[in-house]
Amino acid sequence: MPGSHACDHCRRRKVRCNGADPCSQCSRSGIPCERRTILRRRGPRVAKRPANAESLPQGPRCIDNPEHSVSRDDLLLSVSVSDHGLEGQVAAVHGSPRMSMSSTDSFIHSLAHPPCSVEVTSGSLVRSEFLHVRRRLVSQFNSLQALSGNIEETAHECVDLFMQFLFPNTPIAHEPTLRASIPLLSVDTTPEPTPTENLNPNEPPLIPSLRRFTLITALCAHIISVVPESLSRKPKSVSGIFFEASKSMLRAYEACDLEHPDSTSLTIRMWHSSYAQNTTGKVGASWHYHTEACCLAQRLRLFDEASIARPSLLESQLLRVNFWHLYLAEKTQVAFRSRPPIIDERICDGGITLLDKGNELVPFLDPSREVNQADLESRIFFGFHLRRRMSATAARLIDDIASFSGHVESNSLRANQLNGGDQEMTTLIERYLKFTALVNEVPSWVRHPDRGEDPKVDEQVRTYQATCFWAQRTNIMTIFYCMRLLILQTCIDHGLPAVVGLSESPLSWASRKLEIIQDFLDDLQGTPFICLEAQGETAVGGSRFLTIIQ
């Protein structure tokens, strides 16, 4: 007899069923025609509590409304498992009716928490996230037909460019570690847990591999975004691929990273900040990443020499130089009055006691490379700390000028305070002279990079190192002339031109500005343009400022 309703097969396919037994659709398809589904009345479903509900394990509760629990089926269907490499686990949940309730609850519990909460995420899920992000990165990279070479070759090129053009100004990474991280970009490499003796007990075993993957992809994004295409030979769009991979991987272990930060936590965020600045020219996202790094440095109390010690001498050294680079950036922002500082002597308990150089003697440069000989690293760090002192001295002087001006105005003692014999005025003048004298400390290898002093050094090595010092010289001198103009403008704005040796005549102010600009242009003579171009938005912004303020 004809069936009274559509068969199960037609209902699933949502096609018209003629009600026969077997129906025409099933006959044509050659499949059994069955009617096992129990029809229910249409209308809102009424939830019925099972008789054994008291004995069932409770599912996770909704945070916003604790009166309602999350349905297992809804949760499994709403989670985008393909983004976390969980297809097999979901199939096991749906395809195995004998799966125990406790194992189902355990699986759902892992999905109910954000993937960055590594404390409640199993090692297999962390590994799945790693493999998924890497697979997507390699796929997007290979889809760009214009690229030459594979992804590992590109990463090696980025490390080479960083060490020659940007490491002299931002020596915040360990070259052997960067190069050892490159194989993680290959789909043929399996992330291995850190050996037990080197494992931080506070983090899962795979976290060090995730940190290194995030670090090398952040470096590639940073380099390709900042250096000209004539150097990187890669379109700028490639930097976005690496940045998304780095950002996605950081999210995968972010909770652990924020709870137990290390030197990579700072370096990665600084390179993310640089990428945002160089690709958009906007400071919002860039400032956010930089601020995160500063907050982590403050929480670790890296300003205190007693807090810098780590079991690994390399880690201690990386934390030290990362802090000083953040400090330099903060002082530069203070001088430009672009935002309030996060790292400052006035808000650090006991002041900043961190030494420029500690007892760590681990080289950052790869000693196996011939171009790194002849004390290249020690010379680079000398110039780095000189630039830091320039920014810090200028920032303090600008703050003191503004504070002094506000003090004399509030006390109506302007005539007396501007007396040449006033102690505070004399102190400001002395600090200005101290700042201008810093340019005399620029070493000979930075002042004249092409004049190699060691005849035993190979010509190829000398050329490589000269490029390093040209890049550093460009940065140091740009900072120096920018700070001179900022100090001059601050004195003019606060009615204290005497600090820089000028009268109250606006003509003398304009003449001094032109003099500083001319000195800067003269100083740039002979500088390889590629060294200026490779500094990215920072150098361009400094040069733009020198043009605008005049």
Task: Identify the role of each PLM range.
Residues 178-209, 258-273, 282, 290, ...:
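Intrinsically disordered, low-complexity acidic/Ser/Thr-rich segments used as protein-protein interaction/activation
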Residues 1-47, 51, 142-152, 533:
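N-terminal cysteine-rich, zinc-dependent DNA-binding domains of eukaryotic transcription factors
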Residues 21, 27-38, 61-169, 222, ...:
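Intrinsically disordered, low-complexity activation-like regions
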